[in-house]
Amino acid sequence: MHRYKEEASSLIKLATPVLIASVAQTGMGFVDTVMAGGVSATDMAAVSVASSIWLPSILFGIGLLMALVPVVAQLNGSARREKIPFEIQQGVVLALLISIPIIGVLLQTQFILQLMDVEAVMAGKTVGYIHAVIFAVPAFLLFQTLRSFTDGMSLTKPAMVIGFIGLLLNIPLNWIFVYGKFGAPELGGVGCGVATTIVYWVMFALLLAYVMTSSRLKSINVFGEYHKPQWKAQVRLFKLGFPVAAALFFEVTLFAVVALLVSPLGPIIVAAHQVAINFSSLVFMLPMSVGAAVSIRVGHRLGEENVDGARVASRVGIMVGLALATITAIITVLSRELIAELYTNNPEVISLAMQLLLFAAVYQCTDAVQVIAAGALRGYKDMRAIFNRTFIAYWILGLPTGYILGRTDWIVEPMGAQGFWLGFIIGLTAAALMLGVRLRWMHRQEPDVQLNFSLQ
């Protein structure tokens, strides 16, 4: 029991800075929305539409680079720190390489908006925002590379502190470029993109400075010796990270596609759906942070060849996640009216949002299990299992079920938004079951098998 308490304490210490950094990241999006809304509803809508294109694209890159976390954690745990600089420098090259196709996708924004038949003025502002934020892509991915290094070393506080510096810097920069202060042009919503680009380059510079000057990382000296890019290493990292990137992309696009499928049902339903999704996304940060911490702990334990310790870290992570999810689910059920009223004063929207928040409460526990089990499997480097199972859960089970229940009369009369939310519950529950079973299978393997997985 003492081991479990110690592990829970270590996980919470690692997860808390990750959570706070996520809050800072969300805060930047909130500031963008509010300040753009201060100019006009069109500017606010343009920033929202631009984010729906920008986020899936950049999250794919982040997913690829997240593969570095268990790599670094295992090298650190196995006292092979001298190999870490090579891996991080290969990660830097990979970050720059994948910036190119991501920028290529973002440059197609005009074409995407034409397909969506977006109103001309809003489309112009959306394209302007994307063209400004394109310059942030390399900085964002380079920052993620260095963050994977510090997180893998169990140093999650630097990214947290720098995330809040970025948030504090984002506010005045938005004010300057959105409203045209200190001689800057008044760019409206496009100014949010300019501010975001500056902030991410500053955040990258600050984390680079920390990595190069920190006494805790001095022995590694990650950029002390130059390591030439190696094609084999790039392919290995890409293969390791691609399943995670694809799994992230599946999940993000699932919610984005549902938002599009709900949109013809009318503004009241769309608004209520947005309220429930926004709140559940905020709550999701808790288990997501625990999942990130579990990935680090499992990777470190496997590096030490401590298979039993990796199993304990996985189990404790799921227990902590379930405890937190139970608390947030109870709060959601009891406070759903108050939560809805924080977003809107429209009684029809509040009434429907309260119903959807009940669905959100139902899937919080299974959502916690799936994201933490995925984090543990990342620690084992069992990336392909995450990819296969999330694809089946979200796109074979969740989305089709949601569409059938929400928009057709094949089984019952069309349920509208509630049908799609039942699809979420089915998809996330399926992911939790499949990933949980895979993790249990991993724990039952011989120690040599588990360690061989982690040596991929």
Curated annotation (Swiss-Prot):
GO BP terms, alphabetized: response to antibiotic; sodium ion transport
Key words, A-Z: Antibiotic resistance, Antiport, Cell inner membrane, Cell membrane, Ion transport, Membrane, Sodium, Sodium transport, Transmembrane, Transmembrane helix, Transport
Pfam family, one: MatE
Family: Belongs to the multi antimicrobial extrusion (MATE) (TC 2.A.66.1) family.
Transmembrane domains' residue ranges: 11-31, 53-73, 92-112, 126-146, 159-179, 189-209, 242-262, 268-288, 314-334, 356-376, 385-405, 417-437
Disulfide bonds: none
Protein's name in the database: Multidrug resistance protein NorM
Primary role: Multidrug efflux pump that functions as a Na(+)/drug antiporter. Confers resistance to several drugs, such as norfloxacin, ciprofloxacin, ethidium, kanamycin and streptomycin.
Principal place of residence: membrane
One Gene Ontology cellular component: plasma membrane
Membrane-related topology note: Multi-pass membrane protein
Subcellular location: Cell inner membrane
Signal peptide: none
Matches recorded under CDD domains: MATE_NorM_like
GO MF annotation: an example: antiporter activity
